[in-house]
């Protein structure tokens, strides 16, 4: 998903990945009308002001483009891992996603960070340089910071919020999202 607010390093990584593997990665962007409506209601950086505003931003920049990306799909393969957060601790290898009416496959569910690092090193997988600068979880630039020593992997995401269950909504079922 090209949210329009990704780090330059992330955009460069997409290009490097396409070149290394000789593939084309589809990019799904938010609709300008949706961005304009969001900015009119909350302000361009209104996501800092409330969880509601942040969820609305993620809806415009992530959820709606994802819906277009998955339109007609029967399977969605993700990179979710149980070790990323308490909220993801029970991630199964495969599950039915009733909101999207598809099977969601999480092949890395039981991989820990050491397994990932070994795989990346052994296979020459391109890596976002932000990982080396303390960003184990990378999203939109304004919503992501480097973590401090000892912090959980996803502590740098939406750091201004107090709730431990911070998610953008991509991997949260509707009823769980309503509880957040």
UniProtKB/Swiss-Prot annotation:
Keyword Iron-sulfur attached: yes
Location(s), subcellular: Cytoplasm
Assigned EC number: 1.8.4.10
Binding-site residues for [4Fe-4S] cluster, renumbered to this chain: 57-58, 140, 143
InterPro entries (alphabetical): APS_reductase, PAPS/APS_Rdtase, PAPS_reduct_dom, Rossmann-like_a/b/a_fold
Tree of life domain: Bacteria
GO biological process: cysteine biosynthetic process; sulfate assimilation, phosphoadenylyl sulfate reduction by phosphoadenylyl-sulfate reductase (thioredoxin)
Active site residues per record: 168 (nucleophile)
Leading EC class: oxidoreductase
Cofactor note: Binds 1 [4Fe-4S] cluster per subunit.
Pathway: Sulfur metabolism; hydrogen sulfide biosynthesis; sulfite from sulfate
GO cellular-component term (any): cytoplasm
Cofactor: [4Fe-4S] cluster
Catalytic activity line of the entry: [thioredoxin]-disulfide + sulfite + AMP + 2 H(+) = adenosine 5'-phosphosulfate + [thioredoxin]-dithiol
One term of GO molecular function: phosphoadenylyl-sulfate reductase (thioredoxin) activity
UniProt keywords, alphabetically: Cytoplasm, Iron, Iron-sulfur, Metal-binding, Oxidoreductase
Family to which the UniProt record says this protein belongs: Belongs to the PAPS reductase family. CysH subfamily.
Free-text function comment from the UniProt entry: Catalyzes the formation of sulfite from adenosine 5'-phosphosulfate (APS) using thioredoxin as an electron donor.
Protein name according to UniProt: Adenosine 5'-phosphosulfate reductase
Source organism (scientific name): Rhizobium tropici
Lineage: Bacteria, Pseudomonadati, Pseudomonadota, Alphaproteobacteria, Hyphomicrobiales
Gene from which this protein is expressed: cysH
């Amino acid at each position: 998903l090209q949210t329009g607010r990704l780090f330059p390093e992330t955009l460069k990584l997409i290009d490097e990945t396409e070149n290394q593997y000789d593939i084309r990665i589809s990019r799904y962007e938010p609709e300008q009308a949706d961005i304009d409506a969001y900015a009119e209601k909350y302000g361009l950086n209104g996501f800092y002001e409330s969880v509601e505003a942040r969820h609305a931003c993620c809806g415009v920049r992530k959820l709606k483009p994802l819906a277009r990306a998955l339109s007609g799909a029967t399977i969605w393969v993700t990179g979710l891992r149980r070790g990323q957060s308490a909220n993801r601790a029970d991630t199964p290898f495969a599950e039915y996603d009733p909101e999207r009416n598809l099977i969601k496959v999480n092949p890395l569910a039981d991989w820990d960070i050491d397994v990932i690092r070994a795989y990346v090193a052994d296979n020459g997988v391109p890596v976002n340089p932000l990982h080396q600068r303390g960003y184990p979880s990378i999203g939109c630039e304004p919503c992501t910071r480097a973590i401090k020593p000892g912090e959980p992997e996803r502590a740098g995401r939406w750091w201004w919020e107090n709730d431990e269950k911070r998610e953008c909504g991509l991997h949260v079922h509707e009823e769980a999202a309503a509880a957040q």
